[in-house]
Design a protein with these regions (language model features):
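Glycine-rich, charge-dense phosphate/pyrophosphate-binding loop(s)
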Residues: 18-23, 29-153
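Short, acidic (Asp/Glu-rich) active-site segment that either coordinates a divalent metal cofactor
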Residues: 1-6, 10-12
Length: 153
């Protein structure tokens, strides 16, 4: 359904723009330039057409950026809008609120959502992990007898 709003052919300038943004994104992440992530997540191929289906997209994105998010974008075909934030390193629960930006950004997105969305949304505050993808369950299980894999899968 949401693929139907995308163009079957794209202008060369749009393709060049998005390819350049991917390079910018990789560079920003590899060089830990969080403030440049905003430019690395700019898009002209899938977000503008999907904004017609998700009229809240740009109000949520603008609210997150205005509140201090480093980047914000439509995740896949949506409806998830993801904001990248930062704060002090370490245990979130032992830090002073002023060290963290995610709550202010979440509040701004909630307020924008209440104003522009017909349905309520949820905010999930997460953090990146270095582990990557892992197996949660295997059937049949890999673990047998006294040999155990992480998570006992």
């Amino acid at each position: 359904e949401l693929r139907k709003v995308l163009k079957s052919k794209i202008p060369r300038q749009d393709a060049i723009f998005n390819i350049g943004r991917v390079a910018f994104l990789v560079n920003s992440l590899s060089q830990n330039k969080l403030y440049d992530l905003r430019y690395g997540t700019e898009d002209v191929l899938h977000q503008p057409p999907r904004a017609s289906v998700y009229p809240y997209l740009y109000p949520l994105m603008n609210a997150a950026l205005s509140a201090g998010a480093h980047a914000v974008y439509l995740s896949g075909a949506g409806p998830t809008v993801l904001a990248i934030t930062s704060g002090a390193a370490g245990d979130t629960f032992t830090q002073h609120g002023s060290e963290r930006m995610e709550r202010a950004i979440a509040d701004a997105m909630i307020l924008a959502g209440q104003k522009h969305c017909s349905k309520p949304g949820n905010v999930y505050i997460t953090r990146p992990v270095m582990q990557g993808a892992y197996i949660v369950k295997a059937d049949p299980p890999f673990s047998k007898g006294v040999v155990r894999y992480p998570g006992f899968v």
